[in-house]
Amino acid sequence: MLRAETKARARALQMLYAWELTGNLPMSETATRLARLTGPDPLVFDRAEALATGVVAAADSLDRETEAAADNWRLSRIGTVERNILRLATYELRLGEEPPKVVINEAVQLAHWFAGAKAPAFINGVLDRIAHSLGRL
């Protein structure tokens, strides 16, 4: 059984993916559409929407931080799923509400579930650099 926080991260990733693919609709609209498709889970949904909304608000600075930590990778070369996992985890690392190892491990788990075979190692490396640059590790 997955923890509520893990489910919220997975749902936030789905919201961010949908947000990016739909041309950056307001997050509230993206979240509502996703809830209609997947069914409500208020505890998970509220946390996921809060995370996704925070990521969207800080997307430009999160992207700059990711690109700086992703050696020789422009953001445009990083897949949509991977890019949004990195945004979400970087946002959480900045918030400082969870231990950095938890944030990184959960991001790697999301990569295992939703991204390609090489994504988990890439995500882990980039987030390790970001966590160090933020003084979290």
Annotate each predicted stretch with a short phrase.
Residues 1-137:
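N-terminal interaction/assembly modules
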